[in-house]
Amino acid sequence: IIVTQTMKGLDIQKVAGTWHSLAMAASDISLLDAQSAPLRVYVEELKPTPEGNLEILLQKWENGECAQKKIIAEKTKIPAVFKIDALNENKVLVLDTDYKKYLLFCMENSAEPEQSLACQCLVRTPEVDNEALEKFDKALKALPMHIRLAFNPTQLEGQCHV
């Protein structure tokens, strides 16, 4: 699975702040289908570090409750691509963002045999943004996605979107 479309000229400092996971999609149904599925994570905040890395604060359902997690995504030579060692994934790719309203990103595991890909549409405010969702769906067209979830504003406000 190769994600080719990444954001050109990403300014990582501008993605700082609060975000909400409005929609998610994955290459394999089992990555997202259950509340506690491996890549069913809910982004809360992105914090660029002075070194150009990215701290991702998120929530994930574990052992019957909503747990807080922090992932450090290390910068690479490509501004929109980061290395991670978490959630069984090894890369975070920023596909597109306007910094003010939406951000589209994917998490990828390029290692055989369990190649996987999960992408999310993040929004700044807990509202449904149809324009952002359209961009998300357009970006997904080129990718082998088999499950897609979207959340309503009430879910966006809740812990782990419950």
From Swiss-Prot:
InterPro entries: Blactoglobulin, Calycin, Lipocalin, Lipocalin_CS, Lipocln_cytosolic_FA-bd_dom. PROSITE patterns: LIPOCALIN (PS00213). Keywords: Disulfide bond, Milk protein, Retinol-binding, Secreted, Transport. GO terms for cellular component: extracellular region. It is found in: Secreted. Transmembrane segments: none annotated. Pfam families: Lipocalin. GO terms for molecular function: retinol binding. Disulfide bonds join 66-160, 106-119, 106-121. Its main location: secreted. Alternate disulfide bonds occur in equal amounts. Lactoglobulin is the primary component of whey, it binds retinol and is probably involved in the transport of that molecule. Belongs to the calycin superfamily. Lipocalin family. Under physiological conditions beta-lactoglobulin exists as an equilibrium mixture of monomeric and dimeric forms. This is Beta-lactoglobulin. It comes from Ovis aries musimon (Mouflon).
